[in-house]
């Protein structure tokens, strides 16, 4: 496709988005997409607007001294009935809100953000991983990818604990370049378990009555598209890791499967997940995949990118915006459009 078409779309949509967007979206659009200098008076004014942005202030205000946010009474009761954090909604809420705050131009020196990051690291095991949030039976690579992303975006990439988490994630990369959810996406496919209900199977895992999950085994089982994407999403936030062959191999894994159904029913089985527009993009989508791929340097020189980029262009509406899939939402549509414009601009620049 002509790169001039992409450049035109970027300029048109960016111009429209600048006119109506919330301060954080405007900031990232000006600095990341349009390359404006932080010292530009317009950028400085936008930063001041970000600092006063009510949703940002609310999240900072409700973050408690211990690094956690309040959760509903029902979720707190369920959490208290189990092993406690990091299992439960406290940890999930921390991960989500930390991402939202960084999106809204927040650094770790504000409020009790440092306490939240330290609390996450306090749950780290000696092997490097963090258990939770769904159970404490085994670590979930996609949530560990989510955790390391938050730690890196707040500038903790050189912390030895963060490096240990990254090393653990890389140590369980599989033969095809991807990752799976242990047990649920490898041992579960053994003949004696494949027809069992997941709940019954997980009870066997809890009792220790199954073979162990093995990232170097089960070579007949392909990795999970979305687990892989979540791990890469975390590690790719660090410039040093972006250059590592393991990261590019993981990116190749999900690029080669763009628009295809995930083999695993445990995590976004349908191919429809590729074409869903949503914000926040927590657990994978075509938009999230393209964002990662362009960050890693994929561009027009890779023919595998052509169909995904064409899909993104074709999904743009006549008003110059991309809309949330389940129902249009003005604020979320602005974020989604910001991501789309940034992806297209970076794709063109990677020529």
Q: What kind of region is each of these model predictions?
A:
Residues 1-351:
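Preference for long, amphipathic alpha-helical scaffolds in soluble/luminal domains
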């Amino acid at each position: 496709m002509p790169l001039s078409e992409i450049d035109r779309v970027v300029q048109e949509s960016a111009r429209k988005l600048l006119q109506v967007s919330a301060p954080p979206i405007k900031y990232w659009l000006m600095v990341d997409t349009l390359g404006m200098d932080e010292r530009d008076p317009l950028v400085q004014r936008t930063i001041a607007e970000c600092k006063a942005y009510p949703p940002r202030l609310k999240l900072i205000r409700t973050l408690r001294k211990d690094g956690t946010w309040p959760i509903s009474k029902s979720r707190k009761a369920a959490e208290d009935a189990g092993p406690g954090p990091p299992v439960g909604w406290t940890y999930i809420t921390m991960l989500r809100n930390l991402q939202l705050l960084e999106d809204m131009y927040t650094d770790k020196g504000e409020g009790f953000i440092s306490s939240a990051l330290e609390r996450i690291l306090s749950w780290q095991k000696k092997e490097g991983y963090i258990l939770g949030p769904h159970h404490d039976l085994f670590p979930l690579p996609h949530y560990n990818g989510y955790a390391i992303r938050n730690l890196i975006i707040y500038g903790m990439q050189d912390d030895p604990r963060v490096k240990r988490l990254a090393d653990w994630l890389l140590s369980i990369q599989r033969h095809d370049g991807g990752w799976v959810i242990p047990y649920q996406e490898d041992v579960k496919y053994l003949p004696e378990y494949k027809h069992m209900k997941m709940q019954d199977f997980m009870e066997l895992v809890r009792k220790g009555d199954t073979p162990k999950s093995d990232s170097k085994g089960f070579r007949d089982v392909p990795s999970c598209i979305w687990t892989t994407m979540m791990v890469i999403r975390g590690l790719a936030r660090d410039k040093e890791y972006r250059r590592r062959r393991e990261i590019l191999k993981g990116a190749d894994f999900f690029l080669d499967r763009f628009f295809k159904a995930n083999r695993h029913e445990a995590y976004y089985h349908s191919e429809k997940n590729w074409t869903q527009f949503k914000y926040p993009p927590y657990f994978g989508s075509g938009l999230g995949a393209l964002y990662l791929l362009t960050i890693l340097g994929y561009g027009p020189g890779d023919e595998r990118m052509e169909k995904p980029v064409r899909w993104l262009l074709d999904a743009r509406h006549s008003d110059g915006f991309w809309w949330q899939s389940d129902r249009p939402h003005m604020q979320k549509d602005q974020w989604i459009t910001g991501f789309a414009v940034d992806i297209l601009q970076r794709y063109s620049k990677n020529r």
